[in-house]
Amino acid sequence: MKLGHRSLLDVASLGIPYAFTGITTRGRLTHDDPDLVRRYVTAQTEAIARAKRDKTFALKVMGKYLRTANPAALAESYDIDVQKYMLKVPLTTVEAMRSVLDDLAARIPKAKDSEPRKFFDDSFVRQLQSSGFIDALYR
């Protein structure tokens, strides 16, 4: 318990795949301007690597955007958000998207029967991964 807050549940410890974050765009953009999408995904992947490799820099950026200089709060946020939840290879999986759709089904019943693959395109990240680009970021 820090700063008077109690952790009720560590979602990551449950081992349930879940798409916590993602990049959203119209599907048409991935067809009309794939280079733009590729550049954005590349920059996002580089930013993740920088945050994971350079804690001092990441804490400075987080402090600016979270509008706090509290070192304990920033360190805890870094450990949870960057080290625990940010994936080195930011891939969404069918299982993770299925969990999201199952959650949505209470409000949007047709989500339960939707095909998870319809909602994400992992080809850009997979290209970065297969080219060795992501591994090179961590060397």
Question: Where are the language model's segments positioned?
Answer:
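Secondary-structure end/capping motifs
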Residues: H31-K112
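Small-molecule pocket liners
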Residues: H5-R6, A19-I23, G27-R28, V100-L101
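Ligand-binding "clamshell"
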Residues: M1-A12
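A residue-level marker of the well-folded mature domains of exported/periplasmic proteins
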Residues: K2, P17-Y18, Y65
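Conserved C-terminal helix/tail region of periplasmic/extracytoplasmic solute-binding proteins
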Residues: D102-R139
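Solvent-exposed loop/turn segments at secondary-structure junctions
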Residues: S13-I16, L29-T30
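Short secondary-structure boundary/hinge segments and terminal tails
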Residues: I16-Y18, I80-D81, D121-S123
